[in-house]
């Protein structure tokens, strides 16, 4: 007897419907075809025990199972449930009436309970696209999958419950999530606030510009100057996620298994801060079973790299292409996977190995050669991709001792949102362009072209600072953002002057300047 059930295979953000074909004939062999990985091949033992604990017997027959399409790799334990249901159907223990109506996904424990899986949200989106009536998932994944409307999502705890449901012996209510209500109710702001930061007004200004235009930024300063403190408060001034951004971000975290318990939607912009010992695979993604890396988990949010020179140099260099293209293609011998990674790159570093080069209160013990070698750990091509390079000095005691708090994040956020609204209106006809940092060269020429005086200033800066063509474009993008913050239609001379001032690390005399 031949029976078919349906499930899905996840490869990056791409999901393919998989047909599980189960045939029972005389014999005692178990054959599983269709390019399943080790977890899929091991499913026989889990299914056998789960059936026994659920009150069924594993068929004494020749069982042949095919996972179609057979040339597509299937990975993970989410195939346990459709395989078990298919075996029960082929053995006559469960009627096939509803098999064509539902997609099944879930891992089976030996006692028949269903364990959560990765990628429930993109699987639900695929199930709706394929016009399935419903999706049966482990209970822990139900709210995540129920974000997809026009699809009945049933969260089940055990295999026995699934059998009772598809046999019409027991009724279950589908999980219902009001997506918009849930999204806006949980869209809370960051608990940290720039009002807590005393002084450092120039750095706050740089961070405001970065947030307004989606620019990458690096802060250079001695220990204790507030680099990490200010970076961690950046989410408090970023514009809120849109619903479409939230769905896209949630899909990535779903695939990585990073969604919290009973979380249906990510409503805050991600803030990822990997340790400097991170590997290339953990940073950009990949592995034996392809998983999104930190750059994709930071999609639509912030990737913060503290103590940037302490990262492995080859690890940092793999950031160059994703920073430019805003997506990453992971190619291996057996697969190729694409992940989006449009994020703000924020970094911090000390100015020298001892950390106190240019500090007015501490003596630096590093030689000019040591300082330059330390700075050279960050390659020129990577620095070129960082729009804003900001120097930080320690806050004087008179500023620390002030009782008055700094400007609250809410005020800064209002200005950032207004600037983003200007950009959204400007780029509404350009697909995939939402902020100034994403402008193409043609768009820079159209929207950020300076006048003759501005061109003369840029020429002088290019010659004195030995700036690259990429740095030239970055300056114009930042100047456009400064103009948007001021509500100016055109890029003016003082906008360019401020933008040029944010290219501190392009100067070749860093180790001889003696100050920050």
Model-flagged regions — what are they?
Residues 221, 285, 307:
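The Walker A (P-loop) glycine that initiates the GxxxxGKT/S ATP-binding motif of P-loop NTPases
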Residues 18-24, 283, 387-390:
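Short beta-strand elements
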Residues 1-218, 222-225, 331, 471-472, ...:
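Peripheral, non-AAA+ core regions of ATP-driven protein-machinery
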Residues 300, 306-307, 318:
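Walker B catalytic acidic pair
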Residues 170-209, 213, 240-295:
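P-loop NTPase nucleotide-binding/switch module
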Residues 39-44, 59, 66-76, 289-290, ...:
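Basic, amphipathic alpha-helical bundle interface domains used for macromolecular binding and assembly
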Residues 219-260, 325:
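Walker A/P-loop
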